[in-house]
Amino acid sequence: VLKKIEEFEREGKFDVDVEEDPPTIVLTPENIDYLREKMSSKIKRIFANEMGERFLDNLLKNNKLIIKQVNGIENLNKVKTGALITCNHFNPFDCFTVEKVFRMSENEKDKRLYKVIREGNYTNFPGLYGFFFRNCDTLPLSSNKRTMVNFMKAVDTILQKGDYILIYPEQ
């Protein structure tokens, strides 16, 4: 992947994905409840976030994820409006780290952290990780234009509510 990044950078291909992802199932508007308005979506969100929090705490407790230090949390504490959060991203555990830092912040009690994810992460993953990808306050992108209109409306609503959205630069 790193060699491909260098190659695409030299060639000016900044909009081409360097990862060779498997084909994905297209996410259509009727298959996503971005704002968790349906009762079933709300219940799954609560359950998934509780399971996800326990999973993260277990990773930290067993030293499978180590966060050596956190710099700049005071800046996050000052943000009182909706905000987009971004960071460098190369490891699947990056999302867990950002989630933990968010939970350490003063805003954790009255704000929610949504995560923008790839379409394939939402539609293709089976099992526990798939359940998390579909229900832990995720906002999947889509190759379907109608779905993306709904995505943008949801982003606007979330930011207007004062919540946060994590998006990685490569998305």
State what each model feature region is.
Residues I66-Q171:
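Soluble catalytic domains of membrane acyltransferases
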Residues V1-A83, F90-N91, T157-K161:
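Membrane-interfacial terminal anchoring regions of lipid-handling membrane enzymes
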